[in-house]
């Protein structure tokens, strides 16, 4: 059975009951030439633990783009970062739909079987998974829809194509039902202006006399709070259209809900009364302790104490029931205090940010580092600079060639950060998600024309909420500490929202306790001029645009407070020049690149070994990039390369010469000819002297009696000439 639904700028063709009929729910969705299979399967036996055992897997098949997997194992193996992040988006969007007490192991699998380069796989995959879940026998009574919003030529565009998205100022992904928004992710997309500026204005380390290369200026494209509300409202209307269309089309095909037993909420009014009467002070004290840590061990101690009381033993109260009721009582106390008194568990006001301390370049041998502490959340963020060869290469299903990533952000969350003795493992979905959020926040501030490959690592040393936003703040300062000239400082703050009846409270800089007991997790990062990244997960029903706007502006005030402290810390940064890599970027005639490489790479290998540098060449632009640990080595390598490319006998292998070389009369020299020339460059093995018509000769170090500097006038004579390679001697 096939349904075609035209909605939100795309035609979606759903095939029902065609494939995977043994699954609880399955759907084949086609959009243009993209085909996605989404399946839902569940077990019949509940788990004993009190959580939703939902697993979401998103798999891209290489054959979907006519590819064979690379590497030794020619099949799909470990999921890539994009697959993991997409699975996380689907999970966060669908998890709120499951009824309370649902504890049956459930697996949602989305497989990309055919990939159109212009179709957004994340939008299509979520919509396919949503319909498959809605059609299944799991008691989910409303479909979710995902949409992407771009902002192109001052207009919002729903579900732009992949090529259109590259022209957009923002990338906004929103998921929800016809009644409520459930998940939001946003990033600003930096763009290039058409105004050309000298490369030296972008990267001061470049020698302006040698680099006539030009680069375009980058615009960060931060989004204002008002514009963000407008964009989310635009997305909400699109979600309403699609979700309503899904429900209307598929309601009659939904399977009858299976007779599943839902775990009842553990309630015991007598225990709650007993706690309120005899343990209220202990609970409040536990809340104060929990405000300092993400661990909940204090409540466990109280539960054990209550279960050992005579009343509890007489009434036969189970410790598990006591623990559950105690947790709800704690949540009630926390929320009531915030709503009624405007005071949080740690004594802060609603808009108050925890105390912040900042130290930069605390690691003497790292390129740039920052220890950023906010309350009981602490991040050690380290920036490392590299060359083009250090960039990350990765495959995208819809791209023919591997892509290169020159800015990387890694987030690590060890167990000791929350006082747990857990084994250190490979990064999971949470670590990848938090790292991706921090990367999105910082990326617009890093100029695309930067010659460096940059890796930032955030080590969470303490955590009590908002560790990803601490990573953003620390990361922005670590980049500055490494000498990276970012356009602006970027700060992040985690917001919370609590609803009680008609009242609500927006919280700035939430801690772990408020994240757990609140109704919304809302992370906002940006500069003083606007938002660069945003992530929101809503645990309750719909949120009004007025409340959303209030939260965004409150986040802006918190962000400005943090930026003021970061700006002061930025002024006090002492860059450790001794450990920073030295880099030179200059241009030569593209036809001379072959001379730098030499036969079978012999020349470039000799340069790399002799001067202990790394060299990256761009054959098309004639761009040469030299990096090394010592400035004198980099300068010497640069001078040596310039000497190679300035020779008239350099091999061009059929390349066209510069126009101004066409009619040049090549100078001739005789042994013994004397000249007074200027020292053009100084290298380890001698100096190059400018003779006439731009031709240089080498005065070897063995023939130099006293130190010479660039610009010195020296009288020399030609002692040897091999082709156009001229050796000189001093004239006494």
Curated annotation (Swiss-Prot):
Keywords: Cytoplasm, Magnesium, Metal-binding, Nucleotidyltransferase, RNA-binding, Transferase. Residues 672-731 form the S1 motif domain. It comes from the Bacteria. Its cofactor is Mg(2+). Pfam families: KH_1 (PF00013), PNPase (PF03726), RNase_PH (PF01138), RNase_PH_C (PF03725), S1 (PF00575). One of its GO terms (cellular component) is cytosol. The keyword DNA-binding does not apply. Its EC number is 2.7.7.8. One of its GO terms (biological process) is mRNA catabolic process. NCBIfam families: PRK11824.1. Belongs to the polyribonucleotide nucleotidyltransferase family. This is Polyribonucleotide nucleotidyltransferase. It comes from Campylobacter concisus (strain 13826).
